[in-house]
């Protein structure tokens, strides 16, 4: 399998060379030439110039990068041409799901670990619709609230889909602690959002919805949070805040405490020690 059935693409040339070396070390045998990998493990931007044919793989496995949509402005026109899941606010990983679907043979399997933001985000609606109409969900592990990657700020999920139209199927939902699981009907999911809950909890939700008024039906204007255009410049930690204020006390007038989505809990908030340089309302 390692010699004849494994293919890979990475945009980072060093990662490609390391992968080749690892495969050579695993398959090398005395007196035999090393396996040729130049046409199997390749360096390319797979979203824009995939070197392998569509409908040709039994399994696609990946850890798509979590790159915010603000950082991919230069390739958005190309993404819009190539992907039906394109929206102007979609983060980069969304397109890898559609690419995987295109690469798979019928009945092929896709396994990803990446951001779970598309479960609920508005920009994920087209992708959710594609999954519900064209794929069979096999297994979901939703890690909401549990840190999987130290350097990742977004919550993650493991998703296993099959390129097969759904047919009254059920799938496995594994708890984020990985110590329990339950079955769920794919038909219980909607393209408006993916909510993975056990049937008894889902029934309670339905009762509450019938008796109450949904937030979207209230006379409220709800918008996204602060859009800085460059978070790394405008969002700072405690040390940087103190540094700026020590240089000029007037800086304290434009540095405000910041609550991000991850800081908001069920019944309150936990301040994460981050601040916003708020020049917008301070001419």
PLM feature segments, named:
Residues 16, 21-249:
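Signature of N6-adenine DNA methyltransferases within the class I
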Residues 269-283:
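Contiguous C-terminal substrate-recognition/catalytic subdomains in enzyme active sites
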Residues 12:
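Conserved SAM/SAH-binding beta-strand->alpha-helix loop
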Residues 6-9:
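Conserved SAM-binding motif I beta-strand of class I
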Residues 1-2, 152-156, 272:
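Short, solvent-exposed loop/turn segments at the edges of secondary structure
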Residues 159, 262-263:
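Core structural elements
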